[in-house]
Protein backbone atom coordinates (compact mmCIF):
# COMPACT_ATOMS: atom_id res chain seq x y z
CA UNK A 1 0.00 0.00 0.00
CA UNK A 2 1.71 3.18 -1.22
CA UNK A 3 1.07 6.15 1.13
CA UNK A 4 -0.25 9.39 -0.33
CA UNK A 5 1.98 12.50 -0.23
CA UNK A 6 0.91 14.56 2.78
CA UNK A 7 1.43 17.79 0.84
CA UNK A 8 -1.04 16.73 -1.85
CA UNK A 9 -3.77 15.83 0.63
CA UNK A 10 -3.21 19.03 2.65
CA UNK A 11 -3.44 21.11 -0.54
CA UNK A 12 -6.84 19.57 -1.35
CA UNK A 13 -8.13 20.27 2.17
CA UNK A 14 -6.85 23.86 2.00
CA UNK A 15 -8.53 24.43 -1.37
CA UNK A 16 -11.79 23.04 0.02
CA UNK A 17 -11.62 25.55 2.90
CA UNK A 18 -10.92 28.44 0.50
CA UNK A 19 -13.80 27.57 -1.83
CA UNK A 20 -16.20 27.08 1.10
CA UNK A 21 -15.22 30.49 2.54
CA UNK A 22 -15.61 32.24 -0.81
CA UNK A 23 -19.09 30.81 -1.31
CA UNK A 24 -20.10 31.79 2.22
CA UNK A 25 -18.84 35.37 1.79
CA UNK A 26 -21.62 36.43 -0.57
CA UNK A 27 -19.15 38.75 -2.29
CA UNK A 28 -18.76 36.93 -5.61
CA UNK A 29 -20.65 37.27 -8.88
CA UNK A 30 -23.24 34.66 -10.00
CA UNK A 31 -20.96 33.15 -12.66
CA UNK A 32 -18.20 32.57 -10.10
CA UNK A 33 -20.77 31.10 -7.70
CA UNK A 34 -21.67 28.49 -10.32
CA UNK A 35 -18.01 27.65 -10.99
CA UNK A 36 -17.09 27.40 -7.30
CA UNK A 37 -20.22 25.39 -6.48
CA UNK A 38 -19.27 22.89 -9.18
CA UNK A 39 -15.70 22.74 -7.82
CA UNK A 40 -16.99 22.24 -4.28
CA UNK A 41 -19.23 19.37 -5.37
CA UNK A 42 -16.13 17.73 -6.88
CA UNK A 43 -14.03 18.40 -3.77
CA UNK A 44 -16.57 17.23 -1.16
CA UNK A 45 -16.24 13.46 -1.78
CA UNK A 46 -12.43 13.75 -1.99
CA UNK A 47 -12.26 15.60 1.33
CA UNK A 48 -14.54 13.02 2.96
CA UNK A 49 -12.29 10.24 1.63
CA UNK A 50 -9.14 11.98 2.92
CA UNK A 51 -10.66 12.30 6.39
CA UNK A 52 -11.77 8.66 6.36
CA UNK A 53 -8.29 7.57 5.22
CA UNK A 54 -6.54 9.59 7.92
CA UNK A 55 -8.95 8.32 10.57
CA UNK A 56 -8.23 4.74 9.48
CA UNK A 57 -4.47 5.45 9.62
CA UNK A 58 -4.82 6.88 13.11
CA UNK A 59 -6.93 3.94 14.26
CA UNK A 60 -4.40 1.39 12.98
CA UNK A 61 -1.53 3.32 14.57
CA UNK A 62 -3.37 3.26 17.92
CA UNK A 63 -3.98 -0.48 17.68
CA UNK A 64 -0.34 -1.17 16.80
CA UNK A 65 0.85 1.06 19.66
CA UNK A 66 -1.14 -1.01 22.14
CA UNK A 67 0.39 -4.20 20.74
CA UNK A 68 3.98 -2.88 20.71
CA UNK A 69 3.97 -0.92 23.99
CA UNK A 70 5.82 -2.99 26.63
CA UNK A 71 3.62 -1.71 29.45
CA UNK A 72 0.30 -2.65 27.82
CA UNK A 73 -1.97 -4.88 29.88
CA UNK A 74 -1.85 -8.44 28.40
CA UNK A 75 -5.63 -8.52 28.02
CA UNK A 76 -5.61 -5.17 26.18
CA UNK A 77 -2.76 -6.38 23.97
CA UNK A 78 -4.76 -9.50 23.06
CA UNK A 79 -7.83 -7.40 22.21
CA UNK A 80 -5.70 -5.08 20.09
CA UNK A 81 -4.20 -8.04 18.25
CA UNK A 82 -7.72 -9.24 17.45
CA UNK A 83 -8.69 -5.76 16.19
CA UNK A 84 -5.63 -5.28 13.98
CA UNK A 85 -6.85 -7.28 10.93
CA UNK A 86 -10.12 -5.33 10.94
CA UNK A 87 -8.28 -2.00 11.29
CA UNK A 88 -5.93 -2.96 8.46
CA UNK A 89 -8.86 -3.96 6.21
CA UNK A 90 -10.60 -0.64 6.97
CA UNK A 91 -7.43 1.23 6.01
CA UNK A 92 -7.10 -0.70 2.74
CA UNK A 93 -10.73 0.09 1.88
CA UNK A 94 -10.25 3.80 2.66
CA UNK A 95 -6.97 3.84 0.72
CA UNK A 96 -8.60 2.30 -2.36
CA UNK A 97 -11.54 4.72 -2.25
CA UNK A 98 -9.19 7.71 -2.04
CA UNK A 99 -6.96 6.29 -4.79
CA UNK A 100 -9.85 6.22 -7.25
CA UNK A 101 -10.95 9.75 -6.36
CA UNK A 102 -7.42 11.09 -6.92
CA UNK A 103 -7.15 9.61 -10.42
CA UNK A 104 -7.04 12.09 -13.32
CA UNK A 105 -10.58 12.92 -14.39
CA UNK A 106 -11.75 12.71 -17.98
CA UNK A 107 -13.62 15.97 -18.44
CA UNK A 108 -15.93 14.27 -20.94
CA UNK A 109 -17.05 11.43 -18.67
CA UNK A 110 -20.25 13.12 -17.49
CA UNK A 111 -21.32 14.05 -21.01
CA UNK A 112 -23.87 12.53 -23.35
CA UNK A 113 -22.39 10.74 -26.37
CA UNK A 114 -22.62 10.30 -30.12
CA UNK A 115 -22.78 6.59 -30.99
CA UNK A 116 -21.75 5.49 -34.49
CA UNK A 117 -22.11 1.88 -35.68
CA UNK A 118 -20.95 0.88 -39.17
CA UNK A 119 -21.01 -2.44 -40.98
CA UNK A 120 -17.53 -3.72 -41.80
CA UNK A 121 -16.41 -6.78 -43.74
CA UNK A 122 -19.07 -9.41 -44.34
CA UNK A 123 -21.66 -7.88 -46.66
CA UNK A 124 -25.31 -8.32 -45.65
CA UNK A 125 -24.35 -10.27 -42.53
CA UNK A 126 -22.17 -7.35 -41.37
CA UNK A 127 -25.13 -4.97 -41.77
CA UNK A 128 -27.35 -7.32 -39.76
CA UNK A 129 -24.69 -7.50 -37.05
CA UNK A 130 -24.40 -3.69 -37.00
CA UNK A 131 -28.15 -3.62 -36.41
CA UNK A 132 -27.81 -6.14 -33.57
CA UNK A 133 -25.09 -4.03 -31.94
CA UNK A 134 -27.15 -0.85 -32.21
CA UNK A 135 -30.15 -2.59 -30.62
CA UNK A 136 -27.87 -3.87 -27.83
CA UNK A 137 -26.78 -0.33 -27.03
CA UNK A 138 -30.34 0.99 -27.31
CA UNK A 139 -31.58 -1.61 -24.81
CA UNK A 140 -28.63 -0.88 -22.52
CA UNK A 141 -29.41 2.84 -22.71
CA UNK A 142 -33.06 2.18 -21.87
CA UNK A 143 -32.02 0.21 -18.77
CA UNK A 144 -29.97 3.23 -17.65
CA UNK A 145 -32.74 5.73 -18.26
CA UNK A 146 -30.87 7.35 -21.15
CA UNK A 147 -32.56 8.65 -24.29
CA UNK A 148 -31.49 7.51 -27.78
CA UNK A 149 -32.20 9.73 -30.80
CA UNK A 150 -31.13 8.63 -34.28
CA UNK A 151 -29.26 11.35 -36.19
CA UNK A 152 -28.75 9.45 -39.43
CA UNK A 153 -29.11 5.90 -40.69
CA UNK A 154 -28.47 3.87 -43.82
CA UNK A 155 -30.25 0.53 -43.83
CA UNK A 156 -28.79 -2.70 -45.16
CA UNK A 157 -30.40 -4.42 -48.15
CA UNK A 158 -31.71 -7.32 -46.03
CA UNK A 159 -32.00 -5.48 -42.72
CA UNK A 160 -29.73 -4.00 -40.12
CA UNK A 161 -27.63 -0.95 -40.93
CA UNK A 162 -24.79 -0.08 -43.21
CA UNK A 163 -24.38 2.88 -40.86
CA UNK A 164 -26.33 4.38 -37.98
CA UNK A 165 -25.46 7.46 -35.92
CA UNK A 166 -27.38 8.39 -32.77
CA UNK A 167 -27.26 10.71 -29.79
CA UNK A 168 -27.34 8.92 -26.44
CA UNK A 169 -28.45 11.49 -23.90
CA UNK A 170 -27.96 11.20 -20.16
CA UNK A 171 -25.51 11.92 -17.39
CA UNK A 172 -22.34 9.84 -17.51
CA UNK A 173 -23.12 8.18 -20.85
CA UNK A 174 -19.63 8.70 -22.25
CA UNK A 175 -17.97 7.21 -19.16
CA UNK A 176 -19.92 3.97 -19.64
CA UNK A 177 -19.74 3.69 -23.43
CA UNK A 178 -16.32 5.11 -24.36
CA UNK A 179 -14.57 1.73 -24.21
CA UNK A 180 -16.93 0.35 -26.88
CA UNK A 181 -15.00 2.11 -29.66
CA UNK A 182 -13.26 -0.35 -31.95
CA UNK A 183 -13.91 -3.31 -34.24
CA UNK A 184 -16.48 -5.88 -33.09
CA UNK A 185 -16.43 -9.33 -34.72
CA UNK A 186 -19.28 -11.83 -34.96
CA UNK A 187 -19.08 -15.57 -35.67
CA UNK A 188 -22.40 -17.25 -36.51
CA UNK A 189 -24.35 -19.16 -39.15
CA UNK A 190 -26.29 -16.65 -41.30
CA UNK A 191 -29.97 -17.35 -42.05
CA UNK A 192 -29.06 -17.57 -45.74
CA UNK A 193 -26.39 -20.24 -45.16
CA UNK A 194 -27.71 -23.63 -46.34
CA UNK A 195 -24.60 -25.67 -45.44
CA UNK A 196 -24.55 -24.62 -41.79
CA UNK A 197 -21.14 -22.97 -42.12
CA UNK A 198 -20.05 -20.35 -39.59
CA UNK A 199 -19.34 -16.96 -41.15
CA UNK A 200 -17.23 -14.19 -39.66
CA UNK A 201 -18.14 -10.56 -40.20
CA UNK A 202 -17.48 -7.30 -38.41
CA UNK A 203 -18.79 -3.89 -37.49
CA UNK A 204 -17.02 -0.84 -36.12
CA UNK A 205 -18.23 1.28 -33.23
CA UNK A 206 -17.20 4.84 -32.43
CA UNK A 207 -18.30 6.68 -29.28
CA UNK A 208 -17.71 10.44 -29.17
CA UNK A 209 -18.45 12.78 -26.24
CA UNK A 210 -21.18 15.22 -27.16
CA UNK A 211 -19.63 18.68 -27.42
CA UNK A 212 -21.40 21.89 -26.49
CA UNK A 213 -20.59 25.29 -27.96
CA UNK A 214 -18.47 26.11 -24.89
CA UNK A 215 -16.35 23.00 -25.57
CA UNK A 216 -15.52 23.72 -29.18
CA UNK A 217 -15.84 26.94 -31.18
CA UNK A 218 -16.84 26.56 -34.82
CA UNK A 219 -16.30 29.56 -37.08
CA UNK A 220 -19.13 29.99 -39.58
CA UNK A 221 -16.58 31.06 -42.21
CA UNK A 222 -15.03 27.57 -41.96
CA UNK A 223 -18.26 25.84 -42.98
CA UNK A 224 -19.64 24.86 -46.38
CA UNK A 225 -23.33 24.05 -45.99
CA UNK A 226 -25.30 22.25 -48.70
CA UNK A 227 -29.02 21.51 -48.71
CA UNK A 228 -30.64 18.74 -50.72
CA UNK A 229 -33.65 16.46 -50.81
CA UNK A 230 -33.57 13.52 -48.42
CA UNK A 231 -32.93 10.15 -50.03
CA UNK A 232 -34.18 6.68 -49.21
CA UNK A 233 -32.80 3.23 -49.99
CA UNK A 234 -31.40 3.01 -53.52
CA UNK A 235 -30.94 6.77 -53.73
CA UNK A 236 -34.51 7.76 -54.56
CA UNK A 237 -35.74 11.09 -53.22
CA UNK A 238 -38.28 10.66 -50.43
CA UNK A 239 -39.58 14.23 -50.16
CA UNK A 240 -39.87 17.31 -52.32
CA UNK A 241 -38.28 19.84 -49.95
CA UNK A 242 -34.55 20.29 -49.49
CA UNK A 243 -34.50 19.30 -45.82
CA UNK A 244 -31.29 17.24 -45.82
CA UNK A 245 -28.13 19.02 -44.67
CA UNK A 246 -24.49 18.36 -45.47
CA UNK A 247 -21.88 20.41 -43.61
CA UNK A 248 -18.20 20.39 -44.56
CA UNK A 249 -15.65 21.79 -42.10
CA UNK A 250 -13.12 23.23 -44.54
CA UNK A 251 -10.01 23.34 -42.29
CA UNK A 252 -10.26 19.63 -41.40
CA UNK A 253 -12.28 18.19 -44.28
CA UNK A 254 -14.75 16.60 -41.83
CA UNK A 255 -18.16 16.08 -43.48
CA UNK A 256 -21.47 15.37 -41.72
CA UNK A 257 -24.80 14.59 -43.37
CA UNK A 258 -28.20 14.51 -41.65
CA UNK A 259 -31.62 13.91 -43.24
CA UNK A 260 -33.70 12.18 -40.55
CA UNK A 261 -35.99 15.12 -39.75
CA UNK A 262 -38.45 16.70 -42.17
CA UNK A 263 -37.35 20.10 -40.88
CA UNK A 264 -34.20 21.59 -42.41
CA UNK A 265 -33.70 23.61 -39.21
CA UNK A 266 -33.72 20.47 -37.04
CA UNK A 267 -31.39 18.63 -39.42
CA UNK A 268 -28.97 21.55 -39.36
CA UNK A 269 -28.96 21.62 -35.54
CA UNK A 270 -28.26 17.88 -35.42
CA UNK A 271 -25.56 18.16 -38.08
CA UNK A 272 -23.84 20.92 -36.10
CA UNK A 273 -24.01 18.81 -32.93
CA UNK A 274 -22.41 15.90 -34.80
CA UNK A 275 -19.74 18.16 -36.31
CA UNK A 276 -18.87 19.64 -32.90
CA UNK A 277 -18.56 16.13 -31.45
CA UNK A 278 -16.15 15.05 -34.21
CA UNK A 279 -14.06 18.22 -33.88
CA UNK A 280 -14.00 17.81 -30.10
CA UNK A 281 -12.87 14.21 -30.49
CA UNK A 282 -10.09 15.29 -32.86
CA UNK A 283 -8.96 17.92 -30.36
CA UNK A 284 -8.98 15.39 -27.50
CA UNK A 285 -7.02 12.90 -29.60
CA UNK A 286 -4.40 15.54 -30.42
CA UNK A 287 -3.96 16.34 -26.73
CA UNK A 288 -3.74 12.66 -25.82
CA UNK A 289 -1.31 11.66 -28.58
CA UNK A 290 1.86 12.53 -26.66
CA UNK A 291 0.68 10.60 -23.61
CA UNK A 292 -0.39 7.66 -25.78
CA UNK A 293 3.08 7.55 -27.33
CA UNK A 294 4.58 7.16 -23.85
CA UNK A 295 2.16 4.47 -22.70
CA UNK A 296 0.05 2.34 -25.04
CA UNK A 297 -3.03 1.49 -23.01
CA UNK A 298 -4.84 -1.75 -23.77
CA UNK A 299 -8.12 -0.24 -22.62
CA UNK A 300 -9.31 3.10 -23.86
CA UNK A 301 -6.97 3.53 -26.80
CA UNK A 302 -10.08 4.22 -28.90
CA UNK A 303 -8.47 2.84 -32.05
CA UNK A 304 -11.41 2.03 -34.33
CA UNK A 305 -9.38 -0.50 -36.31
CA UNK A 306 -8.45 -2.44 -33.17
CA UNK A 307 -10.43 -5.69 -32.82
CA UNK A 308 -11.75 -5.39 -29.31
CA UNK A 309 -14.48 -8.03 -28.97
CA UNK A 310 -15.78 -11.26 -30.52
CA UNK A 311 -19.38 -12.48 -30.31
CA UNK A 312 -19.45 -16.25 -30.97
CA UNK A 313 -23.08 -17.34 -31.37
CA UNK A 314 -22.56 -21.15 -31.65
CA UNK A 315 -20.73 -21.13 -28.32
CA UNK A 316 -22.87 -18.42 -26.70
CA UNK A 317 -19.61 -16.62 -25.91
CA UNK A 318 -18.49 -13.00 -25.74
CA UNK A 319 -14.75 -12.33 -25.48
CA UNK A 320 -13.18 -8.92 -24.92
CA UNK A 321 -9.64 -9.27 -26.22
CA UNK A 322 -8.20 -6.23 -24.42
CA UNK A 323 -8.62 -7.74 -20.97
CA UNK A 324 -9.00 -11.44 -21.87
CA UNK A 325 -12.54 -11.47 -20.46
CA UNK A 326 -14.84 -14.27 -21.62
CA UNK A 327 -18.52 -14.51 -20.68
CA UNK A 328 -20.84 -17.31 -21.73
CA UNK A 329 -23.77 -14.89 -21.62
CA UNK A 330 -24.08 -13.86 -25.25
CA UNK A 331 -27.88 -13.56 -25.23
CA UNK A 332 -27.83 -11.45 -22.07
CA UNK A 333 -25.06 -9.21 -23.42
CA UNK A 334 -26.89 -8.69 -26.73
CA UNK A 335 -30.06 -7.90 -24.77
CA UNK A 336 -28.14 -5.21 -22.87
CA UNK A 337 -28.76 -6.86 -19.50
CA UNK A 338 -25.23 -8.25 -19.01
CA UNK A 339 -23.28 -5.54 -20.82
CA UNK A 340 -22.48 -3.93 -17.46
CA UNK A 341 -20.31 -6.95 -16.60
CA UNK A 342 -18.09 -6.15 -19.58
CA UNK A 343 -18.17 -2.38 -19.04
CA UNK A 344 -17.34 -2.65 -15.32
CA UNK A 345 -14.38 -4.94 -16.03
CA UNK A 346 -13.05 -2.50 -18.64
CA UNK A 347 -13.40 0.46 -16.26
CA UNK A 348 -11.59 -1.45 -13.50
CA UNK A 349 -8.71 -2.28 -15.87
CA UNK A 350 -8.53 1.33 -17.05
CA UNK A 351 -8.37 2.52 -13.44
CA UNK A 352 -5.52 0.07 -12.79
CA UNK A 353 -3.64 1.51 -15.78
CA UNK A 354 -4.15 5.05 -14.49
CA UNK A 355 -2.99 4.06 -10.99
CA UNK A 356 0.18 2.57 -12.45
CA UNK A 357 0.80 5.67 -14.56
CA UNK A 358 0.33 7.90 -11.50
CA UNK A 359 2.65 5.75 -9.39
CA UNK A 360 -0.19 4.79 -7.02
CA UNK A 361 -0.45 1.10 -7.90
Curated annotation (Swiss-Prot):
The keyword Protein biosynthesis applies. Keywords: Cytoplasm, Methylation, Protein biosynthesis. The modification N5-methylglutamine is found at residue 236. Residues 285-309 have a biased composition (Basic and acidic residues). It holds the Pfam family RF-1. It is found in: Cytoplasm. Residues 285-312 are annotated as: Disordered. Methylated by PrmC. Methylation increases the termination efficiency of RF1. PROSITE patterns: RF_PROK_I (PS00745). InterPro entries: PCRF, Pep_chain_release_fac_I, Pep_chain_release_fac_I_sf, Prokaryotic/Mito_RF, RF-1. One of its GO terms (cellular component) is cytoplasm. Disulfide bonds: none annotated. The keyword Cytoplasm applies. One of its GO terms (molecular function) is translation release factor activity, codon specific. Peptide chain release factor 1 directs the termination of translation in response to the peptide chain termination codons UAG and UAA. Belongs to the prokaryotic/mitochondrial release factor family. PANTHER family: LD18447P (PTHR43804:SF7). This is Peptide chain release factor 1. The gene is prfA.
Amino acid sequence: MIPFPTERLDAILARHDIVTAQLASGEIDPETVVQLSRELSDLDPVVAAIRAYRAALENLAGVEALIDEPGTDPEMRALAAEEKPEALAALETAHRALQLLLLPKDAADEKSAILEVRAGTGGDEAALFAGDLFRMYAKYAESKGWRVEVISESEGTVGGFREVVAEVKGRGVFARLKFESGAHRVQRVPDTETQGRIHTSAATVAVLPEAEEVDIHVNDADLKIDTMRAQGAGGQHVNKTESAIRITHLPTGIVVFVQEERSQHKNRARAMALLRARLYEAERNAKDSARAADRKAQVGSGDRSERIRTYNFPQGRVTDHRINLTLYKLEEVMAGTALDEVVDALITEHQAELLAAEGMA
